[in-house]
Design a protein with these regions (language model features):
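Catalytic cofactor-binding cores of redox enzymes
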Residues: 10, 22, 195
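Peri-catalytic substrate-binding/gating loops that frame the active-site cleft of hydrolases
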Residues: 1
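Single conserved hydrophobic/aromatic residue that forms the stacking wall/gate
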Residues: 188-198
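Short, surface-exposed loop/turn segments at secondary-structure boundaries that line and modulate
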Residues: 25, 185-188
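An anion/pyrophosphate-binding glycine-rich loop and adjacent beta-alpha core
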Residues: 14-141
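Hydrophobic or amphipathic alpha-helical targeting/insertion segments
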Residues: 4-13
Length: 198
């Protein structure tokens, strides 16, 4: 009961690190001015998808009509060792930066392509659908395009507001005997205690 409805904080537990937000690089970008939020897609898509943009600024060409030599696989180019599997913050920053330079696609130029075609050719459509079936169906329902035929449009969006109860190295709050675990911690998405502040 103590953990519900901000109970620990109301009882004097210190709160820490509320100023950080985790950004998720694979969200469905806005489709119009009336869209109030971006839809989160799974990061697992970057395991099999290649992220790219047209090399031409403000390209209005359909992605399937853009030849390979006119595509910029910017994460693979900038980070050849990691490619599309760079950390979330890096993928998010690079996508935003390149879109701000005018290379973005879709509504307001706020999108990049996540293309599954190479993985479909390599592993087969059946394997890709087995891995991502629910995500592919959700994307098609929202966007109206089959992501196994047309590259997905993605863009970074806020995912997780960090901050929570302050803990010491033993994961105990400033309330004697109150230990804090999981996402109630004043940390990032993982359980790792913060440094004590004196």
């Amino acid at each position: 009961m103590l953990l519900q409805f901000g109970g620990p904080h109301k009882r004097g537990a210190n709160f820490a690190n509320p100023s950080f937000t985790q950004i998720h690089p694979t969200c469905i970008p806005p489709g119009g001015i009336y869209q109030s939020k971006l839809t989160l897609m799974s990061e697992s898509l970057r395991n099999d998808g290649r992220i790219w943009l047209p090399k031409k600024i403000d390209s209005k060409d359909d992605p399937e009509n853009i030849p390979e030599h006119e595509r910029d696989y910017f994460l693979e180019r900038q980070y050849p060792k990691y490619g599309n599997l760079v950390p979330r913050d890096v993928a998010s920053r690079r996508a935003r930066e390149i879109c701000e330079k005018g290379f973005g696609i879709g509504f307001g130029g706020k999108g990049v392509y996540l293309d599954l075609q190479d993985s479909i050719k390599k592993d087969g459509l059946k394997v890709i659908k087995a891995k991502y079936g629910n995500l592919l169906e959700m994307y098609e329902r929202i966007v109206g395009e089959d992501p196994t035929k047309v590259p997905m449009k993605i863009y970074p969006a806020p995912h997780y507001t960090m901050g929570g109860l302050w803990v010491d190295y033993n994961l105990m709050s400033n309330i004697d005997g109150l230990f804090v675990l999981g996402e109630a911690l004043s940390l990032i998405h993982i359980s790792e205690p913060t440094r004590q502040h004196h």
